[in-house]
Amino acid sequence: MIAFHISPVLKVGVRAGPSYVLALMAISVMGIVTGLHSGCLPPPVDSGRDTPPASDADRSIAQNSVKMLAEGRETFRFDTFGSESFWGDALKLHQALAGSANGGVGPGVTPNQALQLGLKVDSDMLIPAVIESLQSGTLNLDDPLTTLDLLRADAVVGVKGFFDQNRTITSIGIQCALCHSTVDDAVLPGIGRRLDGWGNRDLNVGAIIAIAPDLSALANVLQVTQDTVRAVVNAWGPGKFDAELTLDGKGFRPDNRTAATLIPPAFGLAGVNLHTWTGWGSVTHWNAFVSNLEMHGHGTFFDPRLNDPVRFPVAVRAGLHDVRSNPDLITPKLAALHFYQLAIAAPAPADGTFVREAARRGESLFAGKAGCARCHVPPLFTEPGWNMHTPDEIGIDSFQADRSPDGRYRTSPLKGLWTHQKGGFYHDGRFPTLRAVIDHYDGHFDLSLSEAEKDDLVQYLLSL
């Protein structure tokens, strides 16, 4: 077994900052650019109208689109927003990853252990020799030093290591892609090309937090011990995170199950109004919320609803309703980040992953007898407008809804549902299968669906 810390692993030019990404994105939309230079914009749809010559305004819009996509992707994949001051400087998570043999503490985290925690490796950031050694089994994945090499290569999806001139890790920050990207497993399980927007249902955020040597920053704001913090986050399990913990301090539900919720996808959001399971706000609101309050970046965030000592006592103590950092490392990035996210389409299922005839029958049921389309309105598969419902309307308890400002649950968009079956369905995974979801609604709305009709609905949902 070999480690690769002796030779570089980063592909030359793979990531040279926004200018490289801008060039790459420009290539991907070359058809648009070519059309602009020829004086015409290619018609996006068959409108039946003649396409007029492109104006200066048309060119400006198209060129800005290319720029926004490139900058947004760079932000989504690689920007820490200064969060290393929390994850590294405060929690000292980088020390636990490195281990005592590499200037840190404890045994360290090997690549195999990191993969078991649900972290992913971007194979596009690795030179061919490293990929070959991964596939042949000659790369040492049981050495924390190899983990550090992967961090130096910017190959760990959603995690950024900071190193001094002696190649010693000094801090660590996180990126949007940590929770909202995965990989295609093209090289090995957990190692492959990025799939932006896919919720990482393998990621055990709580277990990662729990290994940090110093949780006093969280313990102090929650007014509990560090051991209590570890007990709470270790209960989350893979694919879950509790964004409200540092707002209301509720680590567990009344039934003693974790209060954490499933990590949602960040694709298919174009045309969708409210975001998150309980509709905290639009995508733009949630990006600002998460980057400031959950990632612990340095920016500006204002939401007076959090200034409520009864509902959000922890948020009030921490002043989270009005955050203003100088310098602001987040706000200048939000517009392009939003643009990129809205461009991520929900992925279509592969042929053979659902039964087409059954799906066609299920589509008729979805729009007709089952009444699903009343709330999950095609083609958005959520309601245009204020897509929120009370717990009683959908037949579940109010615990998670009560942790949000509006006390309701969002109608989740359904496209790409096949990508995030792991961990169950609904906000907390209470329904283990799509069939269980349909059984719930069949009883709640007295639909009288037959067993065959339920099966057809499942196939239709898998086809979206």
PLM segments and residue spans:
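Periplasmic c-type cytochrome electron-transfer domains
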Residues: 2-11, 19-21, 28-464
